[in-house]
């Protein structure tokens, strides 16, 4: 639309074409520039996505600093997961002296359906694949767990022969020289991707590119794919509804859940996206016991249900 000669990018990983009118950058890059230059900055307009991070205890400063230190800059603040923002607008007007105009969002183009299941993760994936619900993104809240699931699913015959051949061709030119790279190469050959912030950029970008081409039926990763990355996913599977936030185990906030779930449903491909939440392990085990007992009253009475582990939230 604007032409390559007018577009640049600055991230923590790379810098491309910086002396141009339009720069795409991370929130932290803009915040650091605002701290360096302050009101003297020549940034005329900022389109700030994922504005719900304004309240995040770790990254929120990067959304706050530009608003408070760039008084001559016009801002467009966007979020797909905020509710009533009247109070936020009033607070911004109070702190910046600028007028805030509210734009109500349009309905979601691809509606979502939700399911809460007590099947094992492998069983859930198998049912989803059989039901034509691929591609799947399986969300974990640790990098090790994502890799463990990927290695487990790689033996399930996830990809077709045609997909495996296309993946092999598309991955040509990528160096898999590291220990993790060798593991990833094997997983990709089975149609299973891995995606998290701890990966080298070349591996992460390859997984995103393969997903965009529709070659990966399953991606196992963390909630990083829910932020700022455009990858077509039909079904999101959450392995848990709790996470460790650096201080304690807690339930996902509504915003976090909707941010992750919002990746389901491919515009232009799907009439509906699917979001599946896995029950905790003790609930899954109890469901197995109930199913095994069937309708037999004696067997049902003898069931000793597993309790939630200590500290479970």
Predicted regions and their residues:
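Conserved interdomain linker/interface between the two RecA-like ATPase lobes of SF2 helicase motors
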Residues: 14, 65-157, 186-197
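SF2 helicase catalytic motif II
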Residues: 23, 27-76
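Conserved segment of the helicase C-terminal RecA-like domain
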Residues: 74, 231, 235-296, 300
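Conserved two-lobed SF2 helicase motor
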Residues: 18-35, 190-230
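Conserved nucleic-acid-binding Ia/Ib motif block in the N-terminal RecA-like helicase ATPase lobe
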Residues: 1-32, 90-93, 101-102, 185, ...
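Loop/turn-to-beta-strand initiation segments
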Residues: 6, 19-22, 42-45, 72-76, ...
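Conserved C-terminal RecA-like helicase domain
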Residues: 1-8, 144-218, 246-255
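Catalytic acidic motif of RecA-like/P-loop NTPases
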Residues: 29-31, 51-55, 193, 226, ...
């Amino acid at each position: 639309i604007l032409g390559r000669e007018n577009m640049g990018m600055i991230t923590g990983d790379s810098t491309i074409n910086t002396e141009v009118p339009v720069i795409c950058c991370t929130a932290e890059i803009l915040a650091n520039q605002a701290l360096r230059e302050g009101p003297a900055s020549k940034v005329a307009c900022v389109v700030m996505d994922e504005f719900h991070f304004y309240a995040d205890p770790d990254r929120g400063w990067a959304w706050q600093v530009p608003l408070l230190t760039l008084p001559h800059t016009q801002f467009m603040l966007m979020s797909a997961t905020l509710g009533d923002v009247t109070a936020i607008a009033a607070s911004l007007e109070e702190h910046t002296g600028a007028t805030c105009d509210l734009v109500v969002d349009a309905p979601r183009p691809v509606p979502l359906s939700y399911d809460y299941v007590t099947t094992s993760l492998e069983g859930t994936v198998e049912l989803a694949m059989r039901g034509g619900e691929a591609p799947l993104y399986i969300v974990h809240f640790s990098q090790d767990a994502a890799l463990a699931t990927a290695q487990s699913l790689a033996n399930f015959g996830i990809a077709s022969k045609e997909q495996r051949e296309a993946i092999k061709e598309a991955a040509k030119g990528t160096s898999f020289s590291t220990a993790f790279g060798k593991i990833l190469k094997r997983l990709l050959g089975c149609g299973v991707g891995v995606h998290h912030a701890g990966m080298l950029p070349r591996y992460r970008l390859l997984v995103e590119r393969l997903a965009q081409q529709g070659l990966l039926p399953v991606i196992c990763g963390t909630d990083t794919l829910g932020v700022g990355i455009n990858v077509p996913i039909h079904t999101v599977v959450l392995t848990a509804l709790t996470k460790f936030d650096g201080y304690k185990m807690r339930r996902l906030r509504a915003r976090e859940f909707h941010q992750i779930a919002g990746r389901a449903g491919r515009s232009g491909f799907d009439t509906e996206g699917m979001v599946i939440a896995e029950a905790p392990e003790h609930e899954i085990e109890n469901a197995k016991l109930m199913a095994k007992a069937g309708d037999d009253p004696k067997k049902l009475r003898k069931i000793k249900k597993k309790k939630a582990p200590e500290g479970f939230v």
